[in-house]
Amino acid sequence: MRSVTTAFWGKARPSDGSPSATHPLPAHVLDVAAVAGLVPGHLPVEIDRRTLGFLVALHDIGKFSRPFQAKVPEAWPADALGPYPDLNRPPSGPAHDLVGLSLLGDTLAERLTPILPGGREGWLHLDRGHVWRALAGHHGRPPNPADDYQMSNKIVCNGCKGAAEKFVDDMIAVFQPPPWPKPAQGFDIVRFSWWLAGLTTLADWIGSRQEWFPYVSAETVADPAAYYHGHALPRAKKALAAAGMAKAVIAPFTGLRGLFPRIEAPTPIQRWAEAVSLPDGPSLTVIEDLTGSGKTEAALTLAHRLMDGKRANGVFLALPTMATANAMFGRLADSYRALFAPGSNPSLALAHGRAGLDKRFVAAIEGGAAREPRRGDPADEPAEAHCASWLAEDRRRALLAQVGVGTLDQALLAVLPVRHATLRLFGVTGKALIVDEVHAFDPYMRRELATLLGFHAALGGSAILLSATLPRKLRAELVNAFRAGLGVRKRTELMESSYPLATIAGVASVSETPCQPREGLPRRVTVTRLADQGAAVERIVDANRTGAAVVWVRNTVDDAITAVAALREHGMEPMLFHARFAMVDRLEIEREVLRCFGRDSAGEDRRRVLVATQVVEQSLDIDFDLMVTDLAPVDLLIQRAGRLWRHERGPRAVPGPELLVVSPEPVEAPAVGWIKAVLPGTASVYRDHALLWRSAREVFRRGEIATPEDMRPLIEVVFDRDAEGALPPALEASADDAYAKELTRIGIAAQNVLDLRKGYDVTAGAWDPDTYTPTRLEDRPHVTLRLALLVDGKIVPYADDPDTRRAWALSEVAVAQYRIASCPIPVGLERAAETAKADWGRWERESKFVLLALLVTDGDRYRLDARRENETPVIAWYDALTGLAWS
């Protein structure tokens, strides 16, 4: 006999060849519940999986409503609701997430109370609300009751109410959920709400894919229990495997060499990682050590131990830039499988998708670009559309893979009020989160990172932070943020000032362990001041004649391009590496940089000069004989110096490691324009000119950087703005302005990040869909240019790739919006432009920050006609060796 519930449709976008035009609502929710029950990973609270499955099955209960069912007139459930209303006046009302919230919280409360029992120590209405919002808000944001919530009881007609009641009874019969006693700690319900929202979103995404869950007839789900066990569960198992998310068995930890067999002699920090006693429960480890000490291998060793101890089921490595993520992906490609047992095929993903991804994981988004949904409330857009648009950008996949590598931004989006934040949060949950180059993040991102650590700890995750060195205050801030997520309210004071240093924090204690430096790393780098660019060119020309591998690190792209032009006037052909290249060219240059200056480089390949921006500061395993650098804050100078004489080699073309710093002399009483007179670009990048002055004063006074003994003292003295003589009067204004901006950034970050303790709720953050919440604060907003060419009347991507979407991604270059705000399409090519954009994702098509930039051949380079924000015409030039430049 046909049940009244099966008359209601849950999905109504049949693929070609589908045996049914609709997918019954009970079938869809059972598909999703089956996926949720099989998604691998730990549960953040004690809950029976039968109860969890039952709860997830309630996620779309709001579809028992006339307004939702009326969206597809031909699928109207006439058996339950009578004839379809007037076609000219279809039922209207709140989206189905709000209807669901009302049904769960009010209309069906009596039926659901036995599952979440009340009483003196039991569930309160407020407690249950956290669970209902997590289930109803599975379309990217928590439901916002406002006025519509008050209306939704009126919208649920008697026929819908009766069907919803029968549906709940059916689901209880299928899952037979035991009552879930209220957790002893109220905070457990709050943190569970974040996790449940992410799980439900992910399960709904997978459970909505027709290739994995084809539509069935109402008769097929007439017996819900038979459908669940005989249909939904087997398909869910196959779907998770096809998505690259099936459980991967962890390999037993056998020591560092089990992961890295080529390492003959572990470094001190690696030996520490092998043997240190890890605290019970989630832990935070902070490793501060020299460049080249093996921090990454030590972190992966700790991660493997956590995985083997069932405290993590994967790893996500977060880095500051795409270049560093690319380099880390390459380093992991040969070793990540050692984390898992033979026969496992774990997913490996690069956050911005510029390298080979696991084919099964890629399958999760293939075919997702089906028909575009009707525009309207996001809660009523089909889940397939969210899957396709949300996953179309490769960088978003990494958080769901067993092993992911990407920029920290991708993880930080998990704690910002952006769509699908909880899906990202769920992706991080349960993994060992490794964050590299922590010193490279500004105050805004550090506040975001602190929030992420709190969320991660609350959901049972462990984290490992890597840095050359951190100010003690910052290290304490991150440790306390993590422990706050564990419920520890008392702040911990960190006392140890040794270097290298390893810090481990758990719920019960914090330990600080001094470590020895790696043998061969302690050294002294001579520091020499150069008065200007001309002096730098002379030293580079001389060094190049001797066959030295030389790098000149400039603080702006424009200065880097100028430096290349100056060197070319001396008959040299330096390589240029910066962030203003199309991705396809940037990746090629990156490969060439690693070939010429990487660990395995030798001979004539190394007789080169590289001019680069800050992209060479972090995680690229490259090594130079001589370095010239523009003046920068001392921590960056130390980081850059780490690229000198990094690898063991034979005789070099210069007598010893030397850091040549282009800088004005740090006189006792500098003028207001002290830095701008010599390095105007640097003055605009590093706004605290007193910090630059203190950096110059200290390194030139010492005449060398001795590691490791100088690391901590240099950082502490330069960053102490309150010390006597730290603020020359003429530079005090710039220092105060920079400090005020730093406090402002921290304040903005505090406003932007989600509030863990409010649970998954609209009050936890500014969830307004029209509000843009960035992971990084930019002094100047940027736009993304998608470079294009006109070929045989068609506009095609600048990059050549058989995958059109990938080709467009490889054609991207970011530029400050004040320089290019728009790229007008030439008259007559408007239709060609629209055709080209049809291959873009919907977000890219609609974003005002993504521009189609048509290049025109002009001699041996390309010309781009664009406009500034005030509509003033501007001409830019592009070629694969220089990047984007202006006349």
What are these regions (language model features)?
Residues 1-19, 24-251:
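Accessory nucleic-acid engagement/destabilization modules that flank
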Residues 281-303, 437, 441-442, 467:
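Walker A/P-loop
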Residues 314-336, 350-356, 470-474, 557:
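Conserved Walker A/P-loop ATP-binding site and its immediately adjacent core
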Residues 475, 534-601, 624, 628-887:
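C-terminal helicase lobe and adjacent C-terminal extensions/tails of nucleic-acid helicase motors
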